[in-house]
């Protein structure tokens, strides 16, 4: 019995030894995998550096590099692959290109940088995309990373600003191509200081140039807005002590085409039951519409269907009597404030023919108010002042 009890600790020790041996094997396998991954990464790094050094790749080396990239993506290094690519491969390669021309100035710098860009854009960049083809579909892409590193390490770390500012500088076409291509690459964090520095270089070779904060031109002053809005409500309601200036607005001639007036289609059933059965169905009849002056309000057609304009009556003015037979009242019956708004010769196109129906008259005048032959308008009425004088114009802005 004692021998059996004495042998039991030995059996448990055997189990522990087996577990320890298995753990050691696993650790050894992990170390071997890491060593293999490191060897694969070193081979990829050597291949990429040789491309930057104009040595090229050996036969079938591109295929082996593709397989190495696929293997690395399956290991624990896969999640850090982009970081390794930026901090090691691309940074080292760009430093190799920069060190060859970093001490040049003036015209020699422009010519040397043009040659460097041609080599990078035509040879290095396609080869990088081929080597890291298995990484495609991830953001940022290999192309974006390579161009961003070229911008930050080479373009913005040379005396390029001084070279472009010289009066007799001859800018090679490759320099303009380089700046415009780099300008089209954006980072996920938005506009950065490096991007703004790049735009300051583009202004020296491209004029006019539409940048992030406006239009740059050598012949005209800087325009502070690339999307110019003509805000009528600010011209109507200026703040105290503020001087407003009108920005130059370039309008498209296509906005000056005559507008289409809607056709009022009558439904007999609703007309009998409710007294008004108008619905807008289609468009016809080309009509040139002039902008209706602000201030006309409360146009009524008859006692059964009353449609009011988007204006406000002057204080103390009573409700006007209804108008019959689809005609407007004569101008001498209007109040003094309204007579100043109308002129028989100036506003004659706004007054419809007497034979028109009341509904068509109202539709035409509403369309003339809501439309403007000068441009496209967006309604921002909620964010404006609710002053009665500006109720019609206050919610309209012309967008160019």
From Swiss-Prot:
Residues 334-347 have a biased composition (Polar residues). GO terms for cellular component: TORC2 complex. Residues 301-358 are annotated as: Disordered. GO terms for biological process: TORC2 signaling. It holds the Pfam family HbrB. Residues 348-358 have a biased composition (Low complexity). Belongs to the PROTOR family. Associated component of the mechanistic target of rapamycin complex 2 (mTORC2). Associated subunit of mTORC2, which regulates cell growth and survival in response to hormonal signals. This is Proline-rich protein 5.
